[in-house]
Each structure stands twice: as C-alpha cells, then as structure tokens.
Regions:
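Short, thiol/selenol-centered motifs that function as redox-active sites or metal-ligating centers
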Residues: 62-69
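C-terminal binding/interaction regions
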Residues: 1-25, 84-163
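Active-site phosphate/pyrophosphate-handling residues
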Residues: 42, 73, 128
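Alpha-helical support elements that line or immediately flank enzyme active sites
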Residues: 71-83
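A generic structural motif
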Residues: 62, 80-81, 133
Length: 163
C-alpha cells in the first residue's frame, strides 16, 4: 500500500469514526470557529487541570469536510493528557507542516496520525480546513488559561483584602 493511500485511510477513518466528538461537561473554555471560505465549523471545549498545566479533556462538535473534522479528531487524541506547553508545541508543529506548501515533512513522533495531513500543504485552499480545530484549540487554551489566571488573581486579591 502506498504511503499516500495509507494517509487517506487514516483521514477517512477519523472522519467516519471521530474520537472525542460530542461536547462534554464540565469544561474550562468553549470556542466556536468557522472557516468562512467553505463553511466548515467546529465548537470545541477544553478542560485544563486545576493548576492550568495539563490538558485533561477536549471535546468538540462540528460539521464540514473530511479534512476539518478528521484533523480535529486527531488533535484531540494528541493533546489530551499532555502539558499545555507540549500540546501547544504539537499545534505549532502541525501548523508548520500543513502551511509549508510541502517543504516541511512533519515529525511523526510529535504528530502521530497528524502526519497523514502532510499532503494537505500542497493544496492551499484546504490548509484552513486542516487548521480549523487546531486553531480553535489554541484559542480555547488561551481562554481557559486567562480565566484560571483571572480566578487566581482574584483569589490572591481577596486574600490581601482580608488581611
């Protein structure tokens, strides 16, 4: 079996049998992203550990092409259980690969099934499809981190006021 065919099979499998699809509660942040070019959309929820250091859950719902929906499924598999820093490095690595127009192969050790989207980089119109869920994740982490920092700041402010 050719490598390209294997990659297509991985994408099709994640599209037909998505992982982590279905919005779950509780969650720390929720974002909704739409690709205005084609209408693909995703609502993505992120839950971080109490200290904000680890991704404990990601769930999503959406509609769109096989690339956008499969890429979001792969994203969830890769980042759940990772530290926020490592998860964001994975997002960066995926983004670089699919935006490279074929010049960056991607690291299978880092990207796992995400490597199947390497061929997308040769089709600029599809890059936004592949990145939709990944950028939604990045935005949700920023939102969750900001809210946990705000809670911590308010808590410390309240402690000072009580003294």
């Amino acid at each position: 079996m050719r490598l390209e065919q294997m990659y297509q099979d991985v994408i099709l499998d994640h599209y037909k049998h998505p992982h982590h699809r279905g919005l779950r509660e509780p969650f720390g942040a929720e974002v909704h992203h739409v690709n205005p070019t084609c209408g693909d959309e995703v609502t993505l929820r992120v839950t971080l550990s109490e200290d904000g250091e680890q991704v404990t859950d990601v769930s999503y719902d959406g509609q769109g092409c096989s690339i956008s929906q499969a890429a979001t499924s792969v994203l969830c598999d890769l980042v759940i259980g990772e530290t926020v820093g490592d998860a964001l490095k994975t997002v960066q690595s995926f983004s670089e690969m699919v935006s490279s127009r074929g010049t960056v192969d991607g690291d299978e050790e880092v990207l796992g099934d995400g490597i199947a989207f390497a061929g997308v980089s040769k089709y600029p119109a599809r890059v936004k499809c592949a990145l939709l869920g990944w950028f939604a994740f990045k935005a949700a982490v920023a939102q969750a981190t900001a809210s946990s920092e705000a809670v911590a700041e308010a808590y410390h402010h309240d402690l000072k006021e009580m003294r």
